[in-house]
């Protein structure tokens, strides 16, 4: 399953941590307004299935574009 998590704060980091222990997650993009924050969340899980992206969640078109690029099965 390909997943996209919007927000790399406490909840986003917790989701990434749990997902890193689930073999059915084939890839997960952690996105945040601040790319550094998303990159830090990815670095914490130390898993090549995870990647970081930048998105302004207040802009619907930004979210749509990220969904097109990431092609996730689920968006959180």
Predicted features, each with a name:
Residues 12-15:
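N-terminal Rossmann-fold NAD(P) dinucleotide-binding loop
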Residues 19:
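Aromatic pocket-lining residues of Rossmann-like dinucleotide-binding sites
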Residues 26-29:
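Short beta-strand element of Class I
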Residues 33-37:
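Helix N-cap at the beta1-alpha1 junction of Rossmann-like dinucleotide-binding domains, i.e.
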Residues 54-72, 76:
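Conserved Rossmann-fold cofactor-binding substructure of NAD(P)-dependent oxidoreductases
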